[in-house]
Amino acid sequence: MTNFTTSTPHDALFKTFLTHPDTARDFMEIHLPKDLRELCDLDSLKLESASFVDEKLRALHSDILWSVKTREGDGYIYVVIEHQSREDIHMAFRLMRYSMAVMQRHIEHDKRQPLPLVIPMLFYHGSRSPYPWSLCWLDEFADPTTARKLYNAAFPLVDVTVVPDDEIVQHRRVALLELIQKHIRQRDLMGLIDQLVVLLVTECANDSQITALLNYILLTGDEARFNEFISELTRRMPQHRERIMTIAERIHNDGYIKGEQRILRLLLQNGADPEWIQKITGLSAEQMQALRQPLPERERYSWLKS
């Protein structure tokens, strides 16, 4: 007899029966809605392993997961059969979560393939009859009508690549972000100076946001162009020159410190004496320990690209 680690005898009996292919096939032939049943090649039933879905999610369910090929033979359909011996007001949402997890796991092997259909089925034999709750997860919202409009339609899209710059600069405090990220792949950002000056003069960003913005420009370009960019920016904004130069200097200093740390890491990884490095740098034992953490592979040889 097959043993199952389950929370109740109900679950154990359910799994003993519904993990048997012939029993599962009969169950689906009898209980699947006709239009869905006709999509499935029930002769191709395959019981999926327990590792198919995240363990934390599986702990919420007493379920069985079968996969079947479609009748056209191209693609898969999954059937989740959930067992419940007492009602749960959020059962529909739980089944939706499980279905999403199955879809995610399916496409992890090949992100180009379409999402599979996942058919959740609930097997119920609780003391309260008939089953009292909707099995449409959209009915669980306080406003099901709005939920249907939201989740049955395409989600809102903010595609800055197609928004005219003249419109973007009217977007108040989010304008700087949208403008820079729209044009960041341009080799030369000097053409944006006029618009950036207008936005910065209107105090549409705080110091931390401007720091992040300038650092972003530096990281995605080169230092010479960055210095030219800063010079032109301060020329156009003499009243903000000190503020911008202070931020730019802070960015340069931070980059210099990180560069020094990277060099010391490389020295250690290539056999340099740790005591010698500690002596000439004056670093503490804790700082030396931090330096012993290996560089990510992509950073190890980045100097070759310069």
From Swiss-Prot:
The protein's matches in Pfam families, at most eight in alphabetical order, are given as: Transposase_31
Effect of deleting the gene: A quadruple rpnA-rpnB-rpnC-rpnD deletion shows no change in basal RecA-independent recombination.
Taxonomic superkingdom: Bacteria
A Gene Ontology biological process in which this protein takes part is: DNA recombination
Q: Does the keyword Hydrolase apply?
A: yes
Care to name a GO molecular-function term for this sequence? double-stranded DNA endonuclease activity
Q: Which UniProt keywords apply?
A: DNA recombination, Endonuclease, Hydrolase, Magnesium, Nuclease
Enzyme Commission code(s) on record? 3.1.21.-
What is this protein's function?
A: A low activity DNA endonuclease yielding 3'-hydroxyl ends. Expression of a repaired protein increases the frequency of recA-independent recombination, but also decreases viability probably via DNA damage as measured by induction of the SOS repair response; in a RecA strain expression has no effect on viability but does induce the SOS repair response.
By sequence similarity, the record places it as follows: Belongs to the Rpn/YhgA-like nuclease family.
Q: What is this protein called?
A: Recombination-promoting nuclease RpnD
* Organism encoding this protein: Escherichia coli O17:K52:H18 (strain UMN026 / ExPEC)
The encoding gene: rpnD
